[in-house]
Amino acid sequence: MGKLRVTYVKSAIGYARDQKETLAALGLRRLNQSVLKPDNPSVRGMLFKIQHLVKVEEVEDEVQA
């Protein structure tokens, strides 16, 4: 299973409190900050809720030898 790179690209000022709390739960505090999250239904649901505030990219897991 891959990972998702989530980048905070638009300010949450003026949006509902639950959207701001979702950003905080994902570990996003500052604009243009990126975090890596596992690609699972829980994270996908959070991202769906704030899709207008973030950019999401799929990242493949590194191969460990």
UniProtKB/Swiss-Prot annotation:
Presence of the UniProt keyword Transferase in the record: no
InterPro entries according to UniProt: Ribo_uL30_ferredoxin-like_sf, Ribosomal_uL30_bac-type, Ribosomal_uL30_CS, Ribosomal_uL30_ferredoxin-like
A GO molecular-function annotation: structural constituent of ribosome
Keywords (A to Z) from UniProt: Ribonucleoprotein, Ribosomal protein
One GO CC term on file: cytosolic large ribosomal subunit
PANTHER family reported for this sequence: LARGE RIBOSOMAL SUBUNIT PROTEIN UL30M (PTHR15892:SF2), MITOCHONDRIAL RIBOSOMAL PROTEIN L30 (PTHR15892)
Subunit structure: Part of the 50S ribosomal subunit.
Homology family: Belongs to the universal ribosomal protein uL30 family.
The protein's name in its UniProt record: Large ribosomal subunit protein uL30
Organism per entry: Chloroflexus aggregans (strain MD-66 / DSM 9485)
Lineage: Bacteria, Bacillati, Chloroflexota, Chloroflexia, Chloroflexales
Protein encoded by which gene: rpmD
